[in-house]
Amino acid sequence: MITAAAVPWQHRTVLLHEAVDALVQRPAGVYLDGTYGRGGHSRLILERLDPAGRLIAIDRDPEALANARSGETRIDDPRFSIHHARFAEFESVLDEAGVGQLDGLLLDLGISSPQIDNPERGFSFRFDGPLDMRMDPTRGQSAAEFLASAPFERIKEVVRDYGEERFADAVAKAIVARREEGRPVQRTAELAALVAGAVKTRERGQDPATRTFQALRILVNAELEEVEQGLNRALARLAPGGRLAVIAFHSLEDRIVKTFIARHAREVYDRRMPYATPAPLLMRAVARIKPGEAEVAANPRARSAILRVAERTDVPLPVVVGRYA
């Protein structure tokens, strides 16, 4: 277990040029970076924009905002603004900024290298630190707080469904047993050791704690709900011809993105009415891109990334019961 001694990090933006190349089709347009991180995508987007272009960025992590405003990666550009929000809340940010429709929206899901490599954030089993895992430490329940109070069945469900861990039952039992001894799990090293004892087989090249840590992070940050809500709201805010670019890092997120694009970009016929005209398509699938060998060699964390790109058509959104369908 690595301690909290200063571990230098170098954040490498995954699929940087591929995402921005696909996203920016109108240099004078208005764009949203829904997951600013350390600003890699935002910087390149700004390079591609005309003087009349505009980029709005949001991030839920206060450290990302502080870095964007005054840190080493500060962006000083009149076309740029950054706001503290979850990406599912982006519509309120646009409303406050007086923006109606977007020419492009980028989501880079998952966590950044600075978050992973900071022991105090509690995201990684490689470092000993408080078991927090919140992307926004100012609100919500930490992973330790969840494990200290959740019943066995709920812990098992989270580890099984969000971590796709086949030893979820054993992991949950070990966590609850320790809690009943009066020693609730409070640190990353404690959880990693507990999971290592509960997971009976090893996956090649993967720490036994990987799936459990992923599951808790997804739960604590409501990551899957964020993706679903953000995508549905993006559909209403993208201008005709506007692009949606989403980078996912695990199968649960990517499945949501893939299903969303397919649902709105695939012709659907009602089998009960074989001669009926299919509903007009709201989106057009543009690309599915994975990192090349060179990028994966330089940045192993890019290995699981998938970029999916879709374009909004000019078909108006149907309105159902006072809201968008």
Swiss-Prot record:
This is Ribosomal RNA small subunit methyltransferase H. Gene3D superfamilies: Putative methyltransferase TM0872, insert domain, Vaccinia Virus protein VP39. Its EC number is 2.1.1.199. GO terms for biological process: rRNA base methylation. InterPro entries: RsmH, SAM-dep_MeTrfase_MraW_recog, SAM-dependent_MTases_sf. The lineage of its organism: Bacteria, Pseudomonadati, Pseudomonadota, Betaproteobacteria, Burkholderiales. Signal peptide: none annotated. One of its GO terms (cellular component) is cytoplasm. HAMAP family: 16SrRNA_methyltr_H. S-adenosyl-L-methionine binds at residues 39-41, 59, 90, 108, 115.
